[in-house]
Amino acid sequence: MTKLRGNPWAVLAVLSLGFFMTLLDLTIVNIAIPNMLDRLHASLDDVLWVLNAYALVLAVLVITCGRLGDLFGQRTMFVAGIAVFTIASAACGFAPNPDALIAFRAVQGLGAAMLMPQTLAMITVIFPAERRGAAFGVWGAVAGAATIAGPTLGGLLVTAFDWRWIFFVNLPIGIGVFIASFLLIPGIKTGRRPKLDIPGVILASAALTAICYGLVEGQQYDWGTITGFISIPLIFVVGVVLLALFLFDQRRRQGGEPLIPYALFRSRNFSVMNWVACTLSIGMLGIFLPFTIYLQSALGFSALKAGLALMPMSLVMIVEAPIIGRLTDKIGGKYILMTGLTLFAVGMGSLVLFAGPHSTWYDFLPSLLIAGLGGGATFTPLTTTAMREVPPMLAGAASGVMNTTRQVGSVIGSAAVGALLENRMSVTLTAQASKQAVALPPSFRAPFVTAFRQAATNLTGGAPAPHLPPGTPHSLAAELARLGALTFTDGYVPAMRETMILPIGVVVVAAASCFALKQARRRPTDLAAPPVPAQTGSEGQTPVPGR
């Protein structure tokens, strides 16, 4: 272990495992929603907040935690984040009620916000510019592995045990990463220690909280009044005003110690990549949200089968990402990224065309393989191009900005696509219910149509259970169940197709935006000064080899 301490690839392995945990918890909980509703006696709103509490805290605090890494050291923040995340995971697993689980998920989001930006920052510091593509290729492969492990591992654990084990699974990983961090990751100094911009932290956190809360809860309140004079539009206005004040305050502080150094955006590639990261997050989450519902609710796949159905795409991404990383180091990321985004959009577009009411998993295979080729050629060149010219002393701030744009993009994608899907479902389910209801006795027709009109607001899907009066013949009950399943499947598919036009279009916009990138030279020169080696001291800091 002593020989491996400070080795860039050993450090990368530890960072990647920590990053893996945070991504795993963004996907694994979705599979457990039905089990939580049953075992925890939770409402649908409770379970949705179990999902949103994690994402909301992560989106709000990741930019601040990135800057804290510059202040206190990336290793210190990474280790603290691992500890918080692991303890919160155990607390989630033992949560006695929905309220406690939501609170512990928020703490888990805090841990993820503490460690996530440090992974990107430390990779930027310990690897020279001409080798970062290979490093980010491994990092991207880990992201692909997490997309597999989330639905698949979640399905296995929920099937074998119950929802609590989707949190307990983090414990051995977290403990292992915590120990390995002290053994393998040296303290890293990147130059003069900055001061923390407290007013900036307060303004940024308040602005992001208001905007993200409005996006997360907007659909719940039909984008209107919450209580009294408080409404979703008012929360948005407050968030936008606070964001404007934050940006003005940051501009005024550029000569001192701002939370976001505007010097980062002098790099055209960094600016463009943040835009692409945001649009890609909107597109990817917007694509997979309706498609996952389709697999489980329309086609009747189990949680495990749904995860396995998506596995071919993720496997292609895992295999391809390291290769793309090395290729990015040689020729730059511009055209690789454009090709990857285009292939991903083509794959998802063909997936929409092939998806039908009676599709099987192998009908999706060609489309998923194309999308996997595109996805594998996306994350590595995106991150490498964005971070190539970032000075090591600003790596934490840059990583915080990148992760914030991604998380906010995910929140926007979830809210926008959720609202659009609900709108289209209200039309298509009502139309299908009216069509199928003609086969029912007259007294059952209106309640049947009304039930499906209301079911459009329940995005976890499935045909609504019929409320049958006493004495209903068994044959009629069976016919209602058959027509209900047929109505939902035939109504959901066109709603999904119409909805997915939006996120696929956003991915196309991301691909077109790459025309604005500057293509890197074949042997790029890092514009940043090299990191200042730390001296061994009380924190165990040692020099980090650059090559």
Label each PLM-derived region with a short phrase.
Residues 20, 52-56, 83, 137-145, ...:
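Transmembrane alpha-helical cores of Major Facilitator Superfamily
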Residues 179-198, 218-221, 248-257, 356, ...:
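Helix-loop junctions on the cytosolic side of multi-pass membrane transporters
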Residues 36-37, 68-69, 153-161, 215, ...:
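Interfacial helix-cap and linker-helix signal at transmembrane-aqueous boundaries
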Residues 7-58, 62, 100, 162, ...:
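Transmembrane core module of solute transporters
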Residues 407-518, 524-547:
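Hydrophobic transmembrane architecture of multi-pass small-molecule transporters
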Residues 64-208, 213, 217, 229, ...:
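Helix-loop-helix hairpins in multi-pass membrane proteins, especially solute transporters
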